[in-house]
């Protein structure tokens, strides 16, 4: 994979260390279908490119190039849930521990400024991570932060009928015929996220 590109942007784990890092951190996979194996390892090779060292710990970027709408350290909240789901398989927990802490506590102890710009299923992702590593202490330590995130959505995106609204782009869906950037439509996605978040948070009271 390293030979496919001129590595013009390197972050915490450069191409030169990719093979060693993958061998130490990811679940190794083998199957008779060569191209399937190749896709599997390419995904991990790509994921580690987005692990970034910040002044407050590791973060994970969505784009390697700087984006004008990003938060501190070029982080974008849209993919947090994906990043947690993908990274929960890493053997060394420091990467995902710090990535989560950077989002929720990396802004002078509080959440990143643009964390609520995109829909969130982070409570479900944190629980899914626990299902892999069984680190109950970490999960419960995050509960207060996840509760606060849930309440922020209650304040900003709840309609009078009890449902939640979201715009297309802020829902991570780009543009669609069913929505818009400024319309307050009660989309199935954010309502399912909020329902699952509520269920998970109440289950650990």
Question: Which role fits each region the language model picked out?
Answer:
Residues 51-56, 91, 154-167:
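Proline-centered turn/helix-capping motifs that create local helix->coil transitions or kinks
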Residues 7-141:
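Substrate-binding groove/exosite segments of carbohydrate-active enzymes
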Residues 75, 114, 182-193:
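Short, contiguous, pocket-lining structural segments
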Residues 145-157:
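Active-site cavity-forming subdomains of large catalytic enzyme subunits
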Residues 196:
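Conserved, charged catalytic cores of large soluble enzymes
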Residues 65, 103-111, 169-186:
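Acidic/His metal-coordination segments adjacent to aromatic residues that form catalytic metal sites
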Residues 199-205:
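Conserved small/polar residues in nucleotide/adenosyl-binding loops
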């Amino acid at each position: 994979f390293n030979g496919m590109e001129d590595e013009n942007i390197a972050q915490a784990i450069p191409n030169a260390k990719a093979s060693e890092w993958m061998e130490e951190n990811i679940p190794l996979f083998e199957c008779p279908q060569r191209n399937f194996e190749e896709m599997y390892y390419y995904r991990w090779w790509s994921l580690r490119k987005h692990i970034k060292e910040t002044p407050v710990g590791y973060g994970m970027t969505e784009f390697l190039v700087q984006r004008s709408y990003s938060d501190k350290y070029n982080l974008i909240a849209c993919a947090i849930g994906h990043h947690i789901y993908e990274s929960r398989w890493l053997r060394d927990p420091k990467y995902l521990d710090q990535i989560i802490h950077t989002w929720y506590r990396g802004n002078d102890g509080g959440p990143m400024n643009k964390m609520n710009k995109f829909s969130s299923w982070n409570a479900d992702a944190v629980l899914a991570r626990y299902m892999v590593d069984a680190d109950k202490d970490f999960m419960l330590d995050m509960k207060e932060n996840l509760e606060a995130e849930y309440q922020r959505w209650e304040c900003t995106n709840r309609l009078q009928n009890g449902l939640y609204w979201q715009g297309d782009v802020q829902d991570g869906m780009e543009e669609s015929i069913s929505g818009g950037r400024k319309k307050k439509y009660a989309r199935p996605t954010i309502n399912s996220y909020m329902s699952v978040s509520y269920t998970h948070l109440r289950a650990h009271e």
